Curated annotation (Swiss-Prot):
PROSITE patterns: CBM20, GLUCOAMYLASE. The lineage of its organism: Eukaryota, Fungi, Dikarya, Ascomycota, Pezizomycotina. The gene is glaA. It comes from Aspergillus usamii (Aspergillus shirousami). This is Glucoamylase. Residues 532-639 form the CBM20 domain. Pfam families: CBM_20 (PF00686), Glyco_hydro_15 (PF00723). It is an enzyme of class 3 (hydrolase). PANTHER family: GLUCOAMYLASE (PTHR31616:SF12), TREHALASE (PTHR31616). Substrate binds at W143. Its EC number is 3.2.1.3.
Length: 639
């Protein structure tokens, strides 16, 4: 007799169970639709074919279609890098229609890198210029410049695609197109990381946690990418440890200081964003890199989130265990200071990351540093290490997931009825404010949703780059800058039978000009490889035939976190919208890690919250892990 049957025999009744599951099922349904809205909206904001950004050049990511109050009709290097990293991850998980968008973006950045601007030119600081006109010309107006996070984020996005090219046989494109562009950005990071600049909110001129964190990541994965293309990055290797060393100075003992050289408290979603953009699915809960599940990052999460509890009317009356609307920082006065969609989603995403990391390592640790975070969600929390097989672990994980979902539910509540997401929503009435259809808001929705479904990006190498040097040194290093012109991409087969070719002009491949050498012409070889993407996640549809009575609902539970770790309150609701008396199907589609093996069962939840389990034995399934296979269907009958 299985553990599930023992629970059934005990007549398990969970107080409020139906309500908890109903809320989660409603959020599941909204997110499924909103993810489609977000993907479409992002493409609408990318030139030249984006429906909302007429006049933008090919591959240019426009921050928002808004042209007045405020005017965001520009392309920011930071926002573009974050958005493209999101699209690259979707592409690597099987969304192959994004190929041409990614290629066009990289081609556009070859132009942008070479545009002389108020911050300098290619080799004299120009890569730190924060924004450009959508026709790929310099913005000459007054602005907070330089901003040094952009090159790091752009490098990370391009490395992700470059690695896919290498994995799928397109070595020439990775070596001759992507690597020279990445090398420019890595050279900038190594040369300028120890100099001040404006933060991601474009307001504080100093040293910023977010900037330093993403710079460390970029140099670490940049060095590995250099090796993979048969080159090297000595400036990456010498500076990454020193950047990590400096990163430690942002820890105050109770939270992460967002910026040096600022009179504000330093509690800022800058730090939550830094944690999620340096999340590594292979990492442990390392304090040194402020991984999402680390004691430091969790303590900081509580401090930052709590700083917004009393300043927004929307958050009135909510307890410490409930999610709240989150803005940039409590002292914010822009548009009178309001919650932001991307900030509220960042609060959720960090927790989804942490849940993934705990599940992967099979335990969670509570330390003196993180105790207050856990006690707010689970009153019985105490310092110690809790195995995933323990009831305490299950209770804490369930509480954290509910807390994380609460932030996303706030976004659902204040999103427009058609799913559109602006930059902000009003702190009193929740109405959308500021720039409409903010591209970064949509990217934040997609990444939070993926992490919620345990769909994670590839490792960036944190496990070999988390050791802090004994002594910090205020250093820098010079790299190699070269102008790059992308004139064509190879014909790339991104799925088993579909060839997608980017439309370009000219001939040849890449023209690269080094600072210290004469112009050299290289030819990018057109490839007709039949390689395809093996997704890291698969959309699995569970089809169940089950005759039910009015008021009964069917849920799916199982042995993995995506199916609730056997917790009935975390079960996945099945839909009965196709149900007839002669044909009673229930179904749900769940995104699961490719290759994952697990056990599962279906349960009935009655209107009085009582639970009925299927008969033994537990069902078993292994998610497909094959070239081009991104969907699967499991057909069952209630027993």
């Amino acid at each position: 007799m299985s553990f599930r049957s023992l629970l059934a025999l005990s007549g398990l009744v969970c107080s409020g169970l139906a309500s908890v599951i109903s809320k989660r099922a409603t959020l599941d349904s909204w997110l499924s639709n909103e993810a489609t809205v977000a993907r479409t909206a992002i493409l609408n904001n990318i030139g030249a074919d984006g429906a909302w950004v007429s006049g933008a050049d090919s591959g240019i990511v426009v921050a928002s279609p808004s042209t007045d109050n405020p005017d965001y009709f520009y392309t920011w290097t930071r926002d573009s890098g974050i958005v493209l990293k999101t699209l690259v991850d979707l592409f690597r998980n099987g969304d192959t229609d994004l190929l041409s968008t990614i290629e066009h973006y990289i081609s556009s950045q070859a132009i942008i890198q070479g545009v002389s601007n108020p911050s300098g030119d290619l080799s004299s600081g120009g890569l730190g210029e924060p924004k450009f006109n959508v026709d790929e010309t310099a913005y000459a107006g007054s602005w907070g410049r330089p901003q040094r996070d952009g090159p790091a984020l752009r490098a990370t996005a391009m490395i992700g695609f470059g690695q896919w090219l290498l994995d799928n046989g397109y070595t020439s494109a990775a070596t001759e197109i992507v690597w020279p562009l990445v090398r420019n950005d890595l050279s900038y990071v190594a040369q300028y990381w120890n100099q001040t600049g404006y933060d991601l909110w474009e307001e504080v001129n100093g040293s910023s946690f977010f900037t330093i964190a993403v710079q460390h990541r970029a140099l670490v994965e940049g060095s590995a990418f250099a090796t993979a293309v048969g080159s090297s990055c000595s400036w990456c290797d010498s500076q990454a440890p020193q950047i990590l060393c400096y990163l430690q100075s942002f820890w105050t003992g109770s939270y992460i200081l967002a910026n040096f050289d600022s009179s504000r408290s330093g509690k800022d979603t800058n730090t939550l964003l830094g944690s999620i953009h340096t999340f590594d699915p292979e990492a442990g809960c390392d304090d040194s890199t402020f991984q999402p599940c680390s004691p430091r990052a969790l303590a900081n999460h509580k401090e930052v989130v709590d700083s917004f509890r009393s300043i927004y009317t929307l958050n009135d009356g909510l307890s410490d265990s409930e999610a709240v609307a989150v803005g940039r920082y409590p002292e914010d006065s822009y548009y009178n200071g309001n919650p932001w969609f991307l900030c509220t989603l960042a609060a959720a995403e960090q927790l989804y990351d942490a849940l993934y990391q705990w599940d992967k390592q099979g335990s969670l640790e509570i330390t003196d540093v993180s105790l207050d975070f856990f006690k707010a969600l689970y009153s019985g929390a105490a310092t110690g290490t809790y195995s995933s097989s323990s009831s305490t672990y299950s209770s804490i994980v369930s509480a954290v997931k509910t807390f994380a979902d609460g932030f996303v539910s706030i976004v659902e509540t204040h999103a427009a009825s058609n799913g559109s997401l602006s930059e902000q929503f009003d702190k009193s009435d929740g109405d959308e404010l500021s720039a409409r259809d903010l591209t970064w808001s949509y990217a934040a929705l997609l990444t939070a949703n993926n992490r919620r479904n345990s769909v994670v990006p590839p490792s960036w190498g944190e496990t070999s780059a988390s050791s802090v040097p004994g002594t910090c040194a205020a250093t820098s290093a010079s790299g190699t800058y070269s102008s790059v012109t992308v004139t064509s991409w190879p014909s790339i087969v991104a799925t088993g039978g579909t060839t997608t070719t980017a439309t370009t002009t000219g001939s040849g491949g890449v023209t690269s000009t080094s600072k210290t050498t004469t112009t050299a012409s290289k030819t990018s070889t057109t490839t007709s490889s039949t390689s395809c993407t093996t997704p890291t996640a698969v959309a699995v549809t569970f089809d169940l035939t089950a005759t039910t009575t009015y008021g009964e609902n069917i849920y799916l539970v199982g042995s993995i976190s995506q199916l609730g770790d056997w917790e009935t309150s975390d079960g996945i609701a099945l839909s009965a919208d196709k149900y007839t008396s002669s044909n009673p199907p229930w179904y749900v589609t769940v995104t699961l890690p490719a290759g994952e093996s697990f056990e599962y069962k279906f349960i009935r939840v009655e209107s009085d919250d009582s639970v009925e389990w299927e008969s033994d034995p537990n069902r078993e399934y292994t998610v497909p892990q094959a070239c081009g296979e991104s969907t699967a269907t499991v057909t069952d009958t209630w027993r």
